[in-house]
Amino acid sequence: MKKTLLLLLFTLTTLAGHADEGMWMLTDLKEQNAATMYDMGLDISIDKVYCPDSISLKDAVVHFGGGCTGEIISAEGLVLTNHHCGYSYIQQHSSVEHDYLTDGFWAMSRKEELPCKGLTVTFIDKILDVTPYVKKQLAKDEDPEGLNYLSPSYLSKVAKRFAEQEKIEITPFTALELKPFYGANRYYLFVKTIYKDVRMVGAPPSSIGKFGADTDNWMWPRHCGDFSMFRIYATPDGKPADYNESNVPLKVKKHLTINLGGIKEGDFTFVMGFPGRNWRYMISDEVEERMQTTNFMRKTIRTVRLNNLLEEMLKSDKVRIQYASKYASSANYWKNAIGMNEGLVHLKVLDTKKKQQEKLLAYGREMGTDAYQKAFDAIREIVSKRHDAVYHQQAIYEVCKLGTEFYKIPSTDKVLQALKEGYKVFHATNCLLYT
C-alpha cells in the first residue's frame, strides 16, 4: 500500500479493544493528545515521542523511498520496512540467474549488502507550524490566479525565504517541504535530511513477503511476511553522501528495540509513520466524484493493462522480473479502487455524508448564519464544473502516463492555463500532453 509524505500518523489504541483512532500531527501531541495518552497507559514523556530540538522517536521512524515508513532497528542504520516497499529494489537486483524476487535475499556480511540506485531514507529533523508566516507572504505577494495558497512551486519559494530568515542550516542533503493542511488553513514546514546510500540487506521470498498477493491486498487480517531490510550508509563522520565504497553504516541517533517479554491485553500501543492523506472532510458530491472518476478509471483501465502485462510476464522469466514492480504498483491501487467503491456502497457512505451535511447546515441556520450554506453551495458548484476536467485528466494519467509509460503529463497549472486560453477540456488535455 502506498504512503505519501503529507502528515505523520499517530493512532492510539489498547489491545483490549478500545481505540482512539485518527491522525494527529506530532507537533500537536502535547496540546491535543498528551492527557489521553497518559490515561491510556503511555509511560514515557511526550517529548520522547516527538521533540524538534532533542532526540526522540522521530529519529527512529523514517520516510523510506518515495512513500513508505521505515524503522531504524539497530545502532548501525539497519532499516525495517514492508516487503512491498522494498519490492522495486529487490527487483532492481534480480535476474533470471539470481531471482531474488522468487528466492529471497540475505547478505551474510556487510560486503554482500547491495547498493540500491535511487533509494533514499529521509529523517524528519523538525516540523514547524509556519501558518502566520505563510499567510503574510500570501497577502503581500502577487497572485493573479488566486492559486498560490496551494501551489507547490510557490510554497517552495516561501519555504526557502523562511529558512533564510530563521537561519536554518541547509546542505546538499537537506530538503524543505512546505505543505498545506486542513484545506490550507494551516501550513507546516518539514525540515528533512536525506541519505542516498542505502543498501539491501535482506528480503524473504515473494511466496512469504507477498503471500496472498492481490487477493489479500487491502484486506485484514493478513497472513504474509510483509518485510524487508536495508541499511543506511554515510561518510565516516556520519554525513549523508552519494554511494561510495568508503562509506560506512550510519551511527544513528536512536533505534527501536524489541521487548522480548511480549505484550499482554490492555497494553498501550500507538503507530507512528507516514500514512499519506485522508478525505474525511469531503462532501457527498466529492465522494461521488471520486467514485465516478478516479476509482472508475483506475479499475477500468488498469484491468486491461494488468491483463496484458500478466499475459507477457507468464511467457518469460526475464519479462516477469522486468515488470514485476510495475505490475505490483499498478495492481495496488487497482485493488484499492475496486474495494473502496464496494465499501462506500456497502456502508452507505453517501447517505451518511448527506446526513452529516444537513446536520451542519441546520446548525448554521440555528446560529443565524448562512456561512455554512454558502460554503457548501460553493463547493458543490466547483465539483460540478470541474467534473469533465477531472475525468479527462484521470484518463490521461491512467492511459498515457501509466499505460504507455510517458514521462510527463500536463500539470494542473497547464490545464488551467489552456482552459483560460479557450481550449475545450478534451482538446486542452490532449494538446498539453505533448508540450
Task: Show where each model-derived region lies.
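Short, Lys/Arg- and Gly-enriched loop/turn segments at beta-strand edges
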Residues: 89-92, 276-286
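Charged, amphipathic alpha-helical linkers/stalks
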Residues: 290-376
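Conserved small/polar residues in nucleotide/adenosyl-binding loops
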Residues: 434-435
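Long, charge-dense accessory insertions within large macromolecular proteins
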Residues: 145-232, 238
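Catalytic-histidine neighborhood of serine endopeptidases
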Residues: 80-124
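A conserved glycine-rich beta-strand in the N-terminal activation segment of trypsin-fold
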Residues: 59-76, 255
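Sec/Tat signal peptide C-region and signal peptidase I cleavage site
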Residues: 15-19
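Sec-dependent N-terminal signal peptides
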Residues: 4-13
